[in-house]
Amino acid sequence: YDFLHIDYKVGGVRRFDKNGLLWYEEYPSKEPSFVMNGFVYTLLGIYDLWRITGDEKIKKTIDKCVRTMKESIHLYDSGYWSIYDQDKKELATEYYHKNIHIPLMEVLHKLTGEEIFDSYNKRWKKQLNSKFNKAWLQIMYRIQPRLRRYSK
């Protein structure tokens, strides 16, 4: 658990965003990536540790992580699909959207009781079942790399 508190600047995974929110990076680097599923999986690991130990310090870390997700979850919604990260703002693959992002929202809602996670769970499930969204997603998968290339 202590290794999580090593800042990314010195080889760790901890980072704070411009709003002072705590993040654990799946891919620590100079520029923040803020990969949603990597952060949430870290949160779930910390939660398991707290369940075993009951340590209040660990519970405070969980509370900070939940706050981060509550205040940042909107950044992972394109309006028609979930987003993988905040660096490249990659649209999640259908596999990730269906099998990772949606279930993670369900788990976060069950563990925290926070309605915002249930709201995104339902929203993303609805997006998954939209034929229009799936067609638009295929177009965006082709366009996004080109847009990034030309915007540099």
State what each model feature region is.
Residues 61-108:
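Glycine/small-residue-rich hydrophobic helix-like segments
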Residues 26-30, 43, 53, 63-68:
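Long alpha-helical, hydrophobic tracts
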Residues 18-33, 80-88:
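Acidic/His metal-coordination segments adjacent to aromatic residues that form catalytic metal sites
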Residues 1-17, 56-80, 119-136:
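Long, well-ordered core segments of solenoidal/helical folds
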Residues 49-59, 111-115:
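Inter-helical turn/loop segments and adjacent helix faces that build the functional surface
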Residues 34-50, 93-110:
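Well-ordered alpha-helical segments within folded domains of soluble proteins
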Residues 7-23, 33-46, 73-74:
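A structural motif
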Residues 126-152:
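Membrane-proximal basic amphipathic "stem/tether" segments
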